[in-house]
Regions:
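Short acidic/polar inter-strand loop motif in beta-rich domains
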Residues: 104-111, 476-477, 546-552
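Surface-exposed beta-strand/loop patches in extracellular or lumenal glycoproteins
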Residues: 40-63, 136-139, 145-154, 425, ...
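Extended, low-hydrophobicity, Ser/Thr/Pro/Gly-biased non-transmembrane segments
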Residues: 101-204, 571-574, 581
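Long, ordered, helix-rich scaffold segments
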Residues: 356, 383, 532-885
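Beta-strand-rich binding/interaction modules
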Residues: 64-71, 438-441, 451-542, 636-639, ...
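A surface-exposed beta-strand-loop module
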Residues: 46-118, 139, 174, 521-538
């Protein structure tokens, strides 16, 4: 903790390490009230750094140094320099061995970085800079070493002892203790180190690789969760096969392990051979996990497995290059999920998330490029920009080069850089070299922050049969970047005739048309694209598949959007047309509300939804997505000044009117789908998930009628279903309804039945935290006293406080500022307990400039109170100070 201003680290100051560590030998002695770490490091002067022997400066925090030896000679206090951040030693020769022993306290480590206790087990989290809390080391990603790790602990409490690589030896020490040694043959940076010790059960399977090697697959969990891992195991085997088929990447160790941990700051961690997962990303079975949770497990298992190549075999030179591994791997996992499920639905989900959350980040005080220029605390840059926008940047390269060209580029990247720590530029260079293209201008996506705008206009010349698209790009100022150079923006499009068919696309100067769908490269501030031989006035279908992470504007009328919603051959753009239509209609309602007029819903939206409900051929998951109105958070993001109350009232009014007007078709679809759900055993497969998603959105609309038959249907679904997806939706409908007696009974029944399952209780907290009914803050404050809640568990904090501040906008933003005060209070407490979680919880307050003057003053006041609250962690200080700048 610190009160002085923390140091800013800049990309431009990067220098390679003075020394390299060839071998790392660690021995851990784990006890209940402390642990001892013995390290033996074989170091040498880095030849890239020239001659001479500068001091060796090792990172280390919260370590008690007990012994230090250089080349076998004990060092006294006068022989080294020690402060809170590092240990300095003067080497006497270019190659040397340093041995140290430190005492650490995992049992009291609430920050969950380094080595810590989660419940009864020991585990680690070293990315980004947690290893320095374990032992003195060069804790930076460009120092890669071969690790051998021995773990010693009490045998009865900790029968399972795990680390990276392959197990090579184990034995008993007597006095009730035992040990195990693990050896990882691959060089890795310290952030990929892992250790687990606990009383764990294991589900084991195997996988035969494309070169016919058998790999043992093991998932370790606490005994009560042994029946919740089959889905994760199936997902792992699918992702191993997919990575071989799509990228030619084969697994390289004899064993692959996953461990589920309840107390974890992130989703999961790709440590070499020993992935450590937040239990929420690995445990799933029908009765306890929703469809969304099953899909999250599948996606996260794949993401961490894919890191074995895109992250571990080829890693980052420095943390500014984080998107090198994360953007690429998010792209890989989203493509995997698209192949396993519905590609269009996956794209819709990803884009809705990106536009609501990452676009807001890009428009706020924490805006930064995909490759940031500077940071105070690296854990603040595990962001939507680095991950999700970074993935979109990789996707654009894929779009521009095509699948075959992209694969050539990724093959060259892995071949050229295996075993190295490299940069985003190295990734792009491999793509360029493999395809003979120049991506110099494209690289602005890595260095410029903010969301580009694309303004498009169309003009048809009937006599000449020419259609001209004028495209203008711009990008608003962001912190530290007042003006931007033009990006390379892949604009995928089609032109539709009056029947909704694609017209052949031939640009001026081309001899022949190139099909009905193509990608234009927008590279200038203003460009014209002239299509020839266009027989009639076309309607453009623009930015198909969301081919670039930009804000697009085109002057569509509502009738044109209705036409695209029904006829566009691009599934994503059908959804997008519906979203834009809904936005126009909702913004009209918001204006009426602000002027105190009676609210009138455009009947065209209802008719569009009626047509959707009648379309039995359309994928039910797409029907469900298209029936979902834009969220309050998205409506906030696209507002100049967000009127929280008008947005909430208008959206609720629209939902109410849709539910009333379409009661019959919604009721028909609901009953038909619920009957199949009743008669069919649960499967987490695309068609079943689609059926339940339409069934559940229908129920949520129907519930707004307040009719007794809907209450009965809701209770039947709640009590009579065999899966959490249906049960949780029914519970949420009751919680948001006026049926007080039934609501109270259902909540009590749920909590009583699932009280011993922490992940299910997280869902119970979230359903209540997200309810927009009056009194939301008081409900959340009461729930914080519930025995299942603790501030020390990040999942609980996210489920209750995070859900309230991020999803329950009408209650969080109540005019008296009590919601802001509550959030600031929690951030101040968490700053001392777990700085990473505290800084993430802060995000809603950082968006204070979005709101009316009264709310701005209240939100700003809470940020200032946090800043003045005493010893702030660098995590919280950076976010608060940038938000107030």
């Amino acid at each position: 903790m610190r009160t002085e201003q923390p140091k800013v680290i800049h990309l431009k100051d990067y220098q390679a390490a003075d020394y390299l560590i060839d071998e790392t030998h660690l021995k851990f002695e784990l006890f209940e009230d402390h642990s001892l770490v013995h390290a033996e490091l074989k170091l040498r002067r880095n030849p890239e750094r020239g001659a001479g022997l500068p001091p060796l400066l090792l990172h280390g925090q919260q370590l008690e140094l007990l012994a230090l030896e250089l080349d076998g000679q004990a060092l006294g206090a006068d022989d080294y320099q020690l402060d809170d951040e590092q240990l300095g030693v003067q080497p006497r020769q270019a190659e040397f061995v340093l041995r140290s022993t430190v005492r650490i306290h995992p049992e009291s480590n609430t920050a969950l970085e380094g080595l810590y206790k989660s419940g009864k087990m020991f585990c680690t989290q070293c990315e980004a800079e947690g290893f320095r809390k374990i032992t003195y080391y060069l804790d930076r990603p460009d120092v890669m070493s071969r690790f051998t790790t021995t773990v010693s602990a009490e045998q009865q409490r900790y029968p399972v002892l795990l680390s990276n690589g392959n197990p090579v030896a184990s034995g008993s020490e007597g006095n009730g203790r035992h040990w195990a040694t693990w050896e990882d043959p691959f060089k890795k940076p310290a952030y990929l180190f892992a250790l687990v010790a606990g009383d764990l059960w294991c589900v084991e399977d195997s996988f035969r690789t494309m070169s016919q090697r058998d790999v043992a697959l093991r998932i370790y969990v606490e005994p009560e969760n042994i029946d919740k891992v089959q889905h994760a195991m199936d997902s792992l085997k699918k992702s191993m096969r997919w990575d071989e088929e799509v990228y030619g990447r084969e697994y390289d160790l004899d064993i692959f392990m996953i461990v589920a941990v309840n107390d974890f700051n992130m989703g999961a961690m790709e440590n070499k051979g020993l992935n450590i997962f937040n239990s929420s990303c690995v445990l799933a079975r029908a009765e306890t996990a929703t469809d969304a949770a099953h899909q999250r497990v599948e996606g996260v298992v794949a993401h961490e497995y894919f890191h074995n190549w895109s992250g571990n075999r080829v890693t980052c030179r420095d943390w500014f290059q984080l998107s090198l591994k994360e953007g690429f791997t998010v792209f890989r996992d989203s493509e995997f999920s698209a192949d396993m499920n519905s590609r269009t639905v996956k794209r819709v989900e990803d884009v809705a998330f990106l536009r609501t959350n990452q676009f807001a980040e890009d428009a706020g005080p924490m805006a930064h490029p995909v490759r940031p220029d500077s940071f105070i605390e690296i854990s603040n840059f595990y962001t939507l920009t680095v991950y999700e926008k970074g993935s979109e940047v990789v996707r654009m390269i894929h779009t521009l080069l095509g699948a075959e060209g992209f694969r050539k580029g990724s093959d060259l990247y892995f071949q050229r850089h295996d075993g190295q720590a490299v940069t985003c530029d190295d990734f792009v260079k491999a793509m360029e070299d493999a395809n003979g293209v120049d991506l110099t201008q494209f690289k602005r996506w890595y260095s410029q922050s903010g969301t580009p705008r694309l303004a498009v206009e169309g003009e048809y010349d009937a006599a000449a049969r020419r259609y001209t698209l004028t495209v203008r790009q711009s990008c608003p100022p962001t912190p530290g970047q007042p003006s931007k150079e033009p990006f390379v923006i892949p604009l995928e499009l089609g032109l539709l005739d009056g029947q909704g068919h694609e017209l052949p696309l031939r640009l001026e100067g081309e001899a022949v048309a190139q099909g009905g769908n193509r990608v234009l490269a927008v590279t200038e501030a203003e460009q014209r694209f002239v299509f020839v031989e266009v027989p009639e006035q076309p309607l453009p279908s623009l930015l198909r598949g969301f081919s670039a992470p930009v804000k697009l504007s085109f002057p569509y009328s509502r009738d044109q959007l209705l036409f695209l919603m029904q006829h566009d051959s691009d599934g994503f753009n059908r959804w997008e047309a519906g979203q834009q239509l809904s936005v126009q209609v909702l913004q009209e309602l918001i204006g009426q509300h602000q002027r105190g007029e009676q609210l009138v819903l455009d009947p065209r939206l209802i008719e569009a939804y009626r047509t959707l409900l009648a379309d039995e051929a359309l994928d039910q998951a797409m029907v469900a997505e298209m029936l979902s109105l834009p969220s309050e958070a998205y409506l906030t993001e696209i507002s100049e000044v967000a009127d929280v109350d008008a947005i909430h009232a208008s959206r609720e009014f629209a939902r109410q009117r849709i539910g009333e007007a379409l009661f019959e078709p919604l009721w028909q679809r609901y009953q038909a789908n619920r009957k199949i759900s009743r008669d069919t055993a649960y499967l987490a497969e695309a068609s079943h998930i689609a059926r339940r998603s339409l069934q559940n959105i229908a129920l949520s609309y129907l519930s707004l009628s307040g009719r007794e038959e809907i209450l009965a249907a809701c209770l039947e679904q709640y009590e009579g279903c065999d899966n959490m997806t249906e049960r949780l939706t029914a519970l949420a409908v009751l919680v948001n309804s006026g049926f007080e007696a039934e609501k109270g009974k259902a909540l009590a029944m749920f909590a009583d039945y699932f009280k011993d399952d922490p992940l299910v209780m997280d869902q119970w907290f979230s359903v209540q935290a997200g309810s927009p009914l009056p009194g939301g803050l008081e409900r959340v404050q009461a729930l914080m006293q519930h025995p299942a809640f603790t501030l020390k568990n990040p999942n609980k904090v996210r489920a209750l406080i995070g859900a309230f501040a991020n999803q329950n906008l009408v209650n969080f933003h109540r005019p008296d500022g009590a919601g802001y005060r509550f959030l600031a209070d929690q951030v101040i407490v968490l700053n001392a307990l777990n700085p990473q979680i505290a800084s993430r919880l802060l995000v809603p307050l950082t968006r204070w400039r979005k709101y009316d003057e009264a709310r701005q003053a209240l939100m700003r006041g809470e940020l200032e109170r946090i800043l003045a609250s005493g010893e702030l962690s660098s995590d919280v200080y950076e976010v608060v100070s940038k938000s107030l700048a």
